[in-house]
Amino acid sequence: YKDWPQRIIIDRGPVTTPGNFKLMQKHFKRPFKCIVLLRDLMDVLASYMQWYTENPDAFPNRFGLQTDEEKLAMIMNKDGAVAKDLEAIKNSYNYKDMCHYVKYDDMVTNPEQEFRKIYQFIGEPYFNHNFENPGDVKVNGLSYDDKIVGSNMHKLFAGKVRKVYNPYIEKIPERIREKYGHIRF
């Protein structure tokens, strides 16, 4: 981002894992803040299930795993995508003064209120966003692109920002529910 003209840059990633946090402190010489999104784990896993079921190129389909239980276990193992995010959330509590926590359900049910809190946290005046039909984000000629992990991982639904029921929540294997169902935010 060194060549970007913006004074404030919001990057998506698990910055508060211990390793990432040390790298930020070492190489990013200015104070920084973290916006931590909290979403119930079963909702996250249901989204993963829907994504890898509907998109054959999704990364959980690249390892010869056959069942939902195998795919979700891979995502949740200590080096898995979701496990890294959970580690980042857990470690963020060591730095509460520099973190702002946003519950996913609050964000999708009242986005303007949550964005106002974020702007207050970063010390910036509020900017009116379009929550009725937001469209894709594009900054400095770059669009959000996560195709490396598979198509459509973070696609936006058309229309107003809202919570959308995901029927895959009911298809999460029982052993996965038993092992991880207690993780809620």
Describe the predicted segments one by one.
Residues H27-W51:
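Conserved phosphate-donor/acceptor-positioning beta-strand/loop module used by diverse small-molecule
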Residues C34, C99-Y101, R184:
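Conserved beta-strand scaffold positions in the cores of enzyme catalytic domains, especially
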Residues M49-Y52, K90-Y93, Q120-F185:
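PAPS-dependent sulfotransferases, especially Golgi type II membrane carbohydrate sulfotransferases
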Residues L23, T109-Q113, M153:
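Short acidic alpha-helix initiation/capping motifs at coil-to-helix transition points
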Residues Y1-P31, E54-Q66, F157-A158, N166-K171, ...:
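PAPS-dependent sulfation machinery
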Residues N20, K78-I89, E114, Y168-Y180:
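Alpha-helical packing segments of well-folded alpha/beta enzyme cores
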Residues Y1-K2, M42-I122:
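PAPS-dependent sulfotransferase catalytic domain
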Residues I9-G13, V36-L38, Y101-K103:
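Short beta-strand segments
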